[in-house]
């Protein structure tokens, strides 16, 4: 972690907006380029929060006395906080239940019950327990996370009719309209190929765009297995859902991680614990070896 990254103020992830009323092939690259500026700010903070939870917690102080004795002890309470929340609040994966015993007029109550049961069975077929745990981890640590819902291309009899994928927040985000409704207007997921180029998948209500390096549309690009990345030659597909099928979840209204507000206290605890160890070591050497 660089000195600049250490001094970042963590106040939650930025929500990305656009003033564009309708995203089309003519302006999608421009909208993506502007949104990526804010996403990169979020991405830096997300990466640092994930590393912090894993134990990458540099001490924010320089030892000026007895530099030869510099024990750095990391308590990593951030990991303990995260594990508690994952176990306490996310111990069981999400399931659908009927809100009440009231049914729409003219409907068959057994049909609604069967539909909810069927939907839960499909979720189980999609291994939702592990996917919800991954969603929970990113939500609790980073404050935001996206999931992709897509049509399963070749479902088996025991499979769900849909794919549900938890996306890494380092490589995904959602853009919202800047009006009072804050409607999601485009979902973005991207990856890097073996040549270092970034391939963006941008989903709007009516289209799916494949864009390379925020410069041009992918045109018939194929993977090493010979499969086309897109189903069309110009990098544009029709969105069969009719709406953005990348959904962004927020842990809290300020989009912060579970331990983000206590970062200063956690850093102070690491310094206190390290200085205590240094004090014991220095006192021991002074008493037993004459401070040699």
Predicted regions and their residues:
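Extended, charged amphipathic alpha-helical segments
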Residues: 227-292
């Amino acid at each position: 972690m660089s000195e600049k990254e250490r001094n970042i103020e963590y106040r939650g992830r930025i929500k990305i907006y656009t003033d564009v009323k309708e995203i089309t092939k003519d302006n999608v690259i421009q909208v993506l380029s502007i949104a990526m500026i804010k996403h990169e700010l979020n991405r830096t903070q997300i990466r640092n929060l994930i590393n912090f939870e894993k134990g990458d917690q540099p001490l924010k102080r320089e030892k000026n006395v007895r530099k030869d004795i510099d024990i750095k002890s990391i308590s990593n309470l951030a990991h303990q906080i995260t594990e508690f929340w994952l176990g306490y609040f996310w111990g069981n994966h999400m399931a659908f239940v009927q809100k009440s015993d009231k049914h729409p007029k003219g409907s068959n109550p057994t049909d609604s019950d069967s539909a909810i049961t069927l939907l839960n069975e499909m979720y189980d077929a999609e291994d939702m327990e592990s996917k919800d745990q991954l969603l929970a981890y990113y939500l609790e640590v980073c404050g935001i996370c996206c999931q992709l819902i897509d049509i399963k291309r070749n479902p088996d009899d025991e499979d769900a009719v849909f794919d549900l994928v938890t996306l890494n927040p380092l490589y995904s985000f959602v853009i919202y309209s800047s009006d009072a409704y804050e409607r999601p207007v485009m979902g973005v997921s991207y990856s890097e190929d073996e040549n270092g180029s970034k391939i963006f998948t941008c989903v709007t209500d009516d289209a799916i765009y494949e864009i390379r390096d925020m410069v041009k549309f992918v045109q018939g690009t194929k993977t090493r297995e010979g499969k086309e990345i897109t189903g069309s030659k110009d990098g544009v597909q029709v969105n069969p859902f009719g709406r953005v099928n990348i959904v962004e979840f927020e842990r809290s209204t300020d989009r912060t991680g579970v331990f983000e507000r206590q970062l200063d206290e956690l850093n102070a605890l690491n310094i206190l614990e390290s200085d205590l160890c240094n004090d014991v070591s220095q006192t021991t050497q002074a008493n037993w070896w004459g401070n040699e």
